[in-house]
Amino acid sequence: MATLSQEATLVHQALVARGLETPLRSPVREMDDDARKQLIAGHMTEIMQLLNLDLEDDSLAETPQRIAKMYVNEVFSGLDYANFPKITVIENKMKVDEMVTVRDITLTSTCEHHFVIIDGQATVAYIPKDKVIGLSKINRIVQFFSSRPQVQERLTQQILVALQTLLGTSNVAVSIDAVHYCVKARGIRDATSATTTTSLGGLFKSSQNTRQEFLRSVRHR
């Protein structure tokens, strides 16, 4: 098993303490990625055969292996904290005390109820205290938690808590606007609706002016 970074461990512990960690079996089953892919491919073969698909066809023959590789290496890679991004946090020597906002962060996740796509954008803001973070690291944290089976409400809060933990401040805000393909492509088949979730901490929750400044940046993206 890969050794986790200190940052990954701290974030995981913070989410567990708040009841916000993604539901995982306990104890975690130890298995290397190749073995995991092999088992997933075997189960996908059975599913496709039950759907009466011909896996002898050259278009379908490698699909179980492709899906297994995609699940482990890409769309669900955020289930493994060994993949948590390397975080660069530096001392706030400039004494920045105004809002830092990153808008239009693209994200693609997977609805944990139907295993179909959630496609959206995030806006993340924080007010620095003793530390500032490399801006691209915010995008990577969003991508990490998006790379799991998710519900949007939990995803929003996970990003918030991760940044609060890494930055040592409660002054963090996250908003996500997303289209859920479990609504768009099945069931009611509503192709135009979107879902917005917001999680606010510190001054973003207690100060009306700070909250409104953040929400204006969300509306104007």
Curated annotation (Swiss-Prot):
It catalyses: GTP + H2O = 7,8-dihydroneopterin 3'-triphosphate + formate + H(+). Pathway: Cofactor biosynthesis; 7,8-dihydroneopterin triphosphate biosynthesis; 7,8-dihydroneopterin triphosphate from GTP: step 1/1. Zn(2+) binds at residues 111, 114, 182. One of its GO terms (biological process) is one-carbon metabolic process. Keywords: GTP-binding, Hydrolase, Metal-binding, Nucleotide-binding, One-carbon metabolism, Zinc. One of its GO terms (cellular component) is cytoplasm. It is an enzyme of class 3 (hydrolase). Signal peptide: none annotated. Its EC number is 3.5.4.16. One of its GO terms (molecular function) is zinc ion binding. Coiled coil: none annotated. InterPro entries: GTP-CH-I_C/QueF, GTP-CH-I_N, GTP_CycHdrlase_I, GTP_CycHdrlase_I_CS, GTP_CycHdrlase_I_dom. It holds the Pfam family GTP_cyclohydroI. It comes from the Bacteria. Belongs to the GTP cyclohydrolase I family. Homomer. HAMAP family: FolE. This is GTP cyclohydrolase 1. It comes from Erwinia tasmaniensis (strain DSM 17950 / CFBP 7177 / CIP 109463 / NCPPB 4357 / Et1/99).
